[in-house]
Amino acid sequence: SFVDISKMKPLKIVVNAGNGCANICFENLKKYLPFHFTEQYMKPNATFPHGVPNPMLEECRRPLINQVLLDGADMGVAWDGDFDRCFFIDHKGNFVEGYYMVALLSRYFLNRYKGETIIHDPRVYWCVQKVCKELGGISVESKGGHAFMKETMRKVGGIYGAENSAHHFFRDFSYCDSGMIPWLIVAQIISETNESLYELVSDLEKEFPCSGEINLPASHVDRVMQAVEKEYAKDAKEIQHIDGLGMDFGEWRFNLRASNTEPLIRFNMETRGDKLLLEEKKKAIMEFIKNQN
C-alpha cells in the first residue's frame, strides 16, 4: 500500500478535474478518505465548457487557486484530461512546480525504503539528486517519455520515477504512471509531518530555483539547438545529449528539448540558490534563441 488512511487527518482539499475523466476514479476513492472536499468541474464533459483540461496552463489553474484561498484549504489538486498527471496548489495559492513534487515524493519513498533507486528526467534534477544523496538513495537519469522511464525503472529496479511534467511512475503500480497516487501520498505527508505543502517544498525552491518549462518558437529547431551548444560550449563543465541538449556550468544548468508535435523548443533551467542568476541566464538564452529565428 502506498498510504495508510488511518494516519490521515481531515484535510480540506479542493479538487478540479477540468471536466476530464478523473472523477470516475475519484468517486471510488473519496468514500474511504477522511478529507473535506470542494469539487470543481468534476463531471466529464467532452465539450470542456471551462477550457482545455491542462493545469500546466496558468489560466486553467486560476479557478482552483481562487477556491483554495476562499476555502482556506490545505491544498488544491488538479488533473489533466486523462488524469495520468496531477498538479498541486499550496495553501497560499502558489502553484508548485512538478520538479519539487518529484523531490518531495522521492524523499517520501527513501525515508521508508532505504537505499532504493529513484529515476528522474534530464530537464532539471539537482534537487532530486540532493534528496537521494542525503537519504542514501540512488538517482538514475532517464530520457523523458513513459516508454523510456518504464524501461529504465525495470532495468535498475527503481521504486519511483518521475518526469517534471507531473508524470509519476511507481514500481508497485506495474511501473505505470498515476494521477491518483501522488496526491494521496502528499496528503499523508502533510498529515504525518504537520507541515503545509508550502513548508514542505519551500527549502527545495530556495536551494534550487528553476524556470519551469518555457516553450520557445523555433522554425529550425535542430539548427537553433546546435547554435546554442556552440555558443555556450566553451564555458560548460558538462554537455549531455540524453534528451535534447543539457549544459552544466557548475552554478547553473539548462536543458533544451525539441517538441515532438510543434516547432517549439522546450527550455528548462535551474541554479544553485541564485534567483538573480536564474533570471539573467534565462533572459540571455531566450534572447539568443529568438535571434536565431
Which residue ranges define each predicted feature?
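Phosphate-binding chemistry for phosphorylated carbohydrates and sugar-nucleotides
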Residues: 1-194, 206
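Phosphate-binding and adjacent anionic-ligand microenvironments
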Residues: 113-293
